[in-house]
Amino acid sequence: MTARIIDGKTISAEVRARVAAEVTRLKTDHGITPGLAVVLVGNDPASEVYVRSKHKQTQEAGMASFEHRLPADVPQAELMALIAKLNADPAVHGILVQLPLPKGLDSNAVIDAIDPAKDVDGLNPTNAGRLASGLFALTPCTPLGSIIMAKTVHASLEGMNALVIGRSNLVGKPLVQLLLNENATVTIAHSRTRDLPALCRQADLVFAAVGKAEMVKGDWIKPGATVIDVGINRTPGKDGGKDKLLGDVAFAEAKEVAGAITPVPGGVGLMTVACLLVNTVRAACAIHGLPKPAV
């Protein structure tokens, strides 16, 4: 059996199309143009690529895009002042500070300073607490995208045994909450978990988010399971060749056992920016007292 490939390119395009339709509706019916502000500190090449992609996709969806670039040696107070300004700007519905920040800057203080209503990365403790309480919250984009991808395979996740490998604040913990909201039965595993392969073999859904290339082997996977690979690990090419991007799952092995699987690249990574647009539209609606949009 060869697994169905869950195509991030197709799914993310569908999500962006729904976002664009919702943006058009907000403009036409309410005179609202959702606005996303992205703050980039320093000139990290990978961050530059991400910011350009976010800017392009934001504009393609019909939203307003605001970029703020600061030098790597910017004082913490100046960065905090910019966050306060964006919090107060009615044209801005979403604020994203590109992480990681350069050394010497306090990321936690910056995240805490973002208005939870505009926290489209879903990292502010208020949003984390609301999510854990089953209340409306802006959710970290990668977990949100992971759930959307799983639901292209299964109309309902209710009652399914789901294993989340990884307990980060960015992916693992919010993913557990989203799965609980879907009424899945959830196990969370981490570096201290005993006999991880045995746990994997019991799971109908496996979400791998550990940041270790090809850690999850094919013989760990329950036949027919759905595997969502969140990992993106850059590894040196053979004999000095071009670097490769590998997931946390040994894809070639796992696809012969799983029922459905996401590739790396071409999987969850593409959903992250699409879900950033989703969160921006949701934030705009909530800020203006409108019902949650159909995205």
Swiss-Prot record:
<dbReference type="InterPro" id="IPR020630">
    <property type="entry name" value="THF_DH/CycHdrlase_cat_dom"/>
</dbReference>
<dbReference type="GO" id="GO:0000105">
    <property type="term" value="P:L-histidine biosynthetic process"/>
</dbReference>
<keyword id="KW-0511">Multifunctional enzyme</keyword>
<keyword id="KW-0028">Amino-acid biosynthesis</keyword>
<keyword id="KW-0521">NADP</keyword>
<comment type="subunit">
    <text>Homodimer.</text>
</comment>
<dbReference type="InterPro" id="IPR020867">
    <property type="entry name" value="THF_DH/CycHdrlase_CS"/>
</dbReference>
<feature type="binding site">
    <location>
        <position position="191"/>
    </location>
    <ligand>
        <name>NADP(+)</name>
    </ligand>
</feature>
<dbReference type="GO" id="GO:0005829">
    <property type="term" value="C:cytosol"/>
</dbReference>
<keyword id="KW-0560">Oxidoreductase</keyword>
<protein>
    <recommendedName>
        <fullName>Bifunctional protein FolD</fullName>
        <ecNumber>1.5.1.5</ecNumber>
        <ecNumber>3.5.4.9</ecNumber>
    </recommendedName>
</protein>
<dbReference type="GO" id="GO:0009086">
    <property type="term" value="P:methionine biosynthetic process"/>
</dbReference>
<dbReference type="InterPro" id="IPR000672">
    <property type="entry name" value="THF_DH/CycHdrlase"/>
</dbReference>
<dbReference type="GO" id="GO:0004477">
    <property type="term" value="F:methenyltetrahydrofolate cyclohydrolase activity"/>
</dbReference>
<comment type="function">
    <text>Catalyzes the oxidation of 5,10-methylenetetrahydrofolate to 5,10-methenyltetrahydrofolate and then the hydrolysis of 5,10-methenyltetrahydrofolate to 10-formyltetrahydrofolate.</text>
</comment>
<dbReference type="InterPro" id="IPR046346">
    <property type="entry name" value="Aminoacid_DH-like_N_sf"/>
</dbReference>
<dbReference type="Pfam" id="PF02882">
    <property type="entry name" value="THF_DHG_CYH_C"/>
</dbReference>
<comment type="pathway">
    <text>One-carbon metabolism; tetrahydrofolate interconversion.</text>
</comment>
<dbReference type="GO" id="GO:0035999">
    <property type="term" value="P:tetrahydrofolate interconversion"/>
</dbReference>
<dbReference type="Pfam" id="PF00763">
    <property type="entry name" value="THF_DHG_CYH"/>
</dbReference>
<keyword id="KW-0554">One-carbon metabolism</keyword>
<dbReference type="InterPro" id="IPR020631">
    <property type="entry name" value="THF_DH/CycHdrlase_NAD-bd_dom"/>
</dbReference>
<dbReference type="GO" id="GO:0006164">
    <property type="term" value="P:purine nucleotide biosynthetic process"/>
</dbReference>
<comment type="similarity">
    <text>Belongs to the tetrahydrofolate dehydrogenase/cyclohydrolase family.</text>
</comment>
<keyword id="KW-0658">Purine biosynthesis</keyword>
<dbReference type="InterPro" id="IPR036291">
    <property type="entry name" value="NAD(P)-bd_dom_sf"/>
</dbReference>
<keyword id="KW-0486">Methionine biosynthesis</keyword>
<keyword id="KW-0368">Histidine biosynthesis</keyword>
<keyword id="KW-0378">Hydrolase</keyword>
<feature type="binding site">
    <location>
        <begin position="166"/>
        <end position="168"/>
    </location>
    <ligand>
        <name>NADP(+)</name>
    </ligand>
</feature>
<dbReference type="GO" id="GO:0004488">
    <property type="term" value="F:methylenetetrahydrofolate dehydrogenase (NADP+) activity"/>
</dbReference>
<feature type="binding site">
    <location>
        <position position="232"/>
    </location>
    <ligand>
        <name>NADP(+)</name>
    </ligand>
</feature>
